[in-house]
């Protein structure tokens, strides 16, 4: 049977997840997406296992489906066979090995609820499995694999998102350099690895040590709507053994559906707090130290792959599987309409498309563009055509900030940006006081255009900040321009009256707003007099076309700012 499998997800019992992470909604969204096999996620959590036992019934060997009386009425509106569930869960192992603290995530698949119960009981003697659907255990990955094999020889352990900097097998901060260093004598029992959102198959093909492993992809979804953002293409016997052969031996594993790796939040190097994104070579030139604040740069997936790879490209790998880069359909609709992907209009159009044309994956991958155009018009169909042919613009993610993918140029649609942001705000885990970073320094800054910049909507101004900033920068001499655009930790401007110091300062602020995407609330400008502060505010208001952003900045004398704080 040909189908799509997403095996690594999380229920509502994991931290930072949707309340809709229930069997009912997983079933609903798997139908919408066109997914045949869904991992249950979080099998170690007692309450989740209890819920699974109550709401699932056995289907094919090792697979389950939702009980008929648990199926949401809405689910019946979508065609296709009921999706199957397979027992899955993720374990976070934090332990010391070879003189270094290791933090590794592993996904486990099991053939049934009884095996999940036995393994969970054993893990409960080692650590707390009640507080989080993805338990954190002080358990060596080698020992976790050994315990699993003793309790359930047919279990499958897959190192999860193997390149993620902080919690993975090859992570730059707390991982290993080789599979053998992690799993030792049990390495032969590892047959597959999960590439993760920030890497794709070609990046992994560059590391010959991975040639003997199957490369699989999953969504790691924290809400049902995120199912399938990465997934596996299968042609297998519909059973756990069929799935086992695909993952362990590659028999029936026909390829993967991938995120654009640039969109992953750890693709490039950088420092989110300083709004700094760097290529691996640029990060090395800075010695791994942020030139703005002097702290360590977060090493991204692309850099870590470069460190361990032994090939210039992956063409030498013999058993390569096909892969497809996709983005969710609501984001294509949003990009073509100029609306937010979460807007009512986009959601209504999304639902209508599913009911008229078929599942989301069929629309994105199979249905002829002409048929889509006939039903939905030019822009949506053109967006899908470009997606299928790889005609996208990419702005890479870094240090925990997701990258962005663009399908349209500004002049192609009514919306002035045509850019997509693929994650709802609640799903972006931001530290207090740290704003989303959307620019990237890469031999010159890559500009991201946004519909709303720093609280100032497009309609509120006649000219964009980008145009004003460009115009202002062009009026500076070389030394003034250097001061305005530097990424150095500090810059001193020594000049007499009438030499353009205020103009340079204004240019610096505009540069931070537009090129570095710094929030106005993070900008402080100190003046010697109240009159100078007033003049600075007035000139900024003139440049920005509104007071809103200026009022969010901290502009004043030293004493007035101290009083405000």
Describe each PLM feature range.
Residues 1-2, 28, 46, 57, ...:
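C-terminal functional module detector
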Residues 2, 21, 49-191:
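Extended substrate/RNA-proximal surfaces in nucleic-acid metabolism proteins
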Residues 8, 42, 108, 157, ...:
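Conserved, mostly hydrophobic/aromatic
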Residues 9-22:
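Active-site mouth loops of central-metabolism enzymes
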Residues 12-14, 40-49, 94, 115, ...:
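Active-site environment of divalent metal-dependent phosphoester hydrolases
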Residues 17, 49-53, 167-174, 205, ...:
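Histidine/acidic-residue-rich catalytic or RNA/ligand-binding cores of hydrolases
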Residues 29-48, 156-158:
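Divalent metal-dependent hydrolysis catalytic cores, especially in the metallo-beta-lactamase
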Residues 463-565:
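P-loop NTPase Walker
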């Amino acid at each position: 049977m040909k189908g799509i499998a997403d095996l690594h997800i999380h229920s509502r019992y994991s931290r930072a997840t949707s309340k809709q992470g229930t069997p009912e909604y997983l079933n609903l969204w798997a139908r919408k997406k066109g997914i045949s096999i869904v991992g249950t996620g979080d099998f170690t959590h007692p309450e989740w296992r209890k819920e699974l036992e109550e709401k699932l019934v056995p289907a094919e060997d090792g697979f389950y489906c939702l009980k008929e009386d648990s199926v949401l009425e809405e689910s019946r509106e979508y065609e296709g066979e009921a999706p199957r569930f397979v027992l899955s869960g993720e374990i976070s192992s934090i332990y010391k090995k070879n003189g270094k603290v290791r933090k590794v995530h592993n996904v486990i698949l099991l053939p049934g609820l009884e095996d999940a119960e036995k393994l969970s009981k054993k893990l409960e003697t080692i650590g707390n499995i009640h507080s989080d659907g993805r338990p954190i255990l002080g358990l060596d990955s080698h020992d976790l694999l050994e315990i699993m094999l003793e309790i359930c020889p047919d279990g499958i352990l897959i190192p999860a998102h193997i390149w993620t900097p902080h919690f993975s097998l090859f992570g730059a901060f707390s991982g290993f350099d080789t599979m053998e260093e992690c799993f030792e004598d049990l390495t032969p029992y590892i047959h597959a690895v999960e590439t993760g959102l920030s890497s794709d198959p070609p990046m992994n093909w560059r590391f010959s040590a991975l040639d003997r492993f199957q490369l699989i992809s999953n969504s790691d979804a924290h809400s049902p709507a995120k199912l399938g953002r990465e997934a596996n293409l299968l042609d297998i016997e519909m059973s756990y053994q069929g799935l086992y052969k695909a993952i362990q031996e590659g028999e029936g594993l026909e390829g993967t559906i991938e995120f654009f790796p640039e969109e992953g939040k750890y693709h490039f190097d950088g420092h989110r707090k300083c709004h700094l994104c760097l290529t691996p070579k640029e990060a090395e030139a800075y010695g791994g130290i942020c030139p703005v604040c002097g702290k360590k740069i977060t090493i991204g997936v692309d850099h870590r792959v470069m460190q361990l790879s032994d090939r210039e490209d992956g063409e030498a790998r013999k058993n390569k599987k096909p892969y497809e880069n996709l983005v969710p359909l609501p984001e294509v609709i949003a990009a073509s309409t100029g609306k937010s992907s979460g807007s009512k209009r986009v959601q209504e159009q999304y639902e209508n498309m599913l009911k008229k044309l078929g599942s989301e994956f069929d629309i994105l991958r199979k249905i002829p563009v002409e048929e889509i155009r006939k039903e939905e018009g030019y822009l949506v169909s053109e967006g899908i055509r470009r997606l299928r042919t790889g005609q996208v613009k990419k702005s890479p993610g870094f240090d925990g900030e997701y990258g962005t993918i663009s399908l349209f140029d500004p002049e192609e649609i009514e919306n002035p940006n045509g850019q997509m942001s693929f994650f709802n705000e609640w799903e972006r885990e931001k530290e207090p006081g740290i704003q989303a970073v959307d620019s990237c320094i890469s031999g010159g800054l890559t500009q991201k255009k946004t519909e709303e910049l720093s609280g100032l909507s497009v309609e509120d101004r006649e000219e964009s900040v980008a145009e004003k900033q460009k115009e202002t920068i062009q009026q500076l001499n070389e030394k003034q321009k250097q001061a305005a655009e530097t990424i150095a930790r500090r810059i001193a401007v020594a000049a007499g009256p009438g030499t353009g110091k205020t103009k340079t300062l204004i240019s610096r602020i505009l540069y931070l707003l537009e090129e570095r995407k710094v929030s106005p609330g993070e900008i402080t400008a100190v003046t010697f007099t109240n009159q100078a502060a007033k003049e600075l505010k007035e000139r900024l208001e003139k440049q920005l076309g509104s007071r809103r952003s200026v009022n969010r900045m901290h502009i004043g004398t030293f004493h007035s700012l101290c009083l405000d704080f």
